[in-house]
Amino acid sequence: MKHAIKNIHFIGLGGSGMSGIAEVLHNLGYVISGSDLSDSATLQRLARLGIKTFVGHAASNLAKVDAVVTSTAVQADNPEVLAAREKRIPVVPRALMLAELMRLKQGIAIAGTHGKTTTTSLVASVLAEAGLDPTFVIGGRLNSAGANARLGLGDYIVVEADESDASFLNLLPVMAVVTNIDADHMETYGHDFANLKKAFVDFLHRMPFYGTAILCTDDPAVREIVPQVSCPITSYGFGEDAQVRAVNVRPVGAQMHFTAQRRNGVTLPDLEVVLNLAGEHNVLNALSAIAVAVELNVPDTAVQKALAEFKGVGRRFQSYGDVPAKGGGHFTVIEDYGHHPVEVAATLAAARGAFPGRRLVLAFQPHRYTRTRDCFEDFVKVIGQADAVLLAEVYAAGETPIVAADGRSLARALRVAGKLEPVFVSEIDAMPQAILDNALGGDVVMCMGAGSIGLVPGKLLELEGAQ
């Protein structure tokens, strides 16, 4: 980065990807400031670190700035963007700033439609346990670090590679993981799945000739792109042909136990793994971290310890403990960021394994009208796998409502399918009381979605405490 650039301002600082980059740059010695539309715990934490934060966007926030970083949510007519353009201050997309950070280290980029945050966290934890002291920028809060970013002194930087706006094509990693490829954010790719797959191939081709692609070949779309990938590949999955493979997989409470077989060129001894996460989808995420560890010669003991002691990621199968039920007994509250049908299905399956025999109550807030429209039938099928459903209105994320792609339409479709009788909750603020009114002793309540439903578990505990 040019030494003339010292003061960097972030528009949309409260976002998980933005705040992580800002924190790393702050720790590198840059003078960081940033703004967001509303105050948040993230802004408050960054302020405590010494970063100047603003609530609201205004041209006056750019008093002394050499460069401006924007998130994809920031519009071109944002007053701070307009002020920067007028002053000829460079306006840099978030992904380009992340790419600049990666130039300082050897980059390990985690891509895929689902599982990026957990996988990035697992890889960072394994490298940290091995003493490699990685830098990481994650889309969620790594519980063991208490943050979503950290500047390490080691050679590696582990980052999420975001395909939602194709910005991962700005990154230049030396190692890349692809967890899966699924139809999401299709407006970016002209609603053509072939374009999405090509973008992943192009992403992998941004690695140098000595780079390694670590691919989950259980995923059909990932298997389809393998012949087009020219760099060395390590495959992982449950399939017999996977070079890093999980066998003897079994849930034990909220953990997964399995044996990892590793046979990429040289066959290594089987590795007995205790993973402190629930669900077979997280076994796949752990396999990718094991594959990275093999490439970097991480000792087996470090891999085993990191996975067994993994403390999880905020909003990923996060437990809020037990809450008294109206009719007696207690119900367990779990919160998860999953908002695509594939993610919801995997998380419900994980809950079945972690809490066998217990009734699953899904409190779900759909995220984006376009996703609800494009995945409508899949949502009906997956949501119907719960034993009871509390359905919120769609979290718009800035989108305009779409007819027949809202929460009421989903509730109606579930009734027509005859799977269950959902409770529609029109205002998310009413969800905590709706949960208290409907949950029974022994239930597991899953609060799921990428929007404001993330606030529901905390408000539920407050409401229960006040009664």
Curated annotation (Swiss-Prot):
Residues reported to bind ATP: G112, T113, H114, G115, K116, T117, T118
Domain of life the protein comes from: Bacteria
This protein's record includes keyword Cell cycle: yes
Documented EC number(s): 6.3.2.8
Catalyses which reaction(s): UDP-N-acetyl-alpha-D-muramate + L-alanine + ATP = UDP-N-acetyl-alpha-D-muramoyl-L-alanine + ADP + phosphate + H(+)
Short name of any one Pfam family annotated for the protein: Mur_ligase_M
Function: Cell wall formation.
Protein name (database record): UDP-N-acetylmuramate--L-alanine ligase
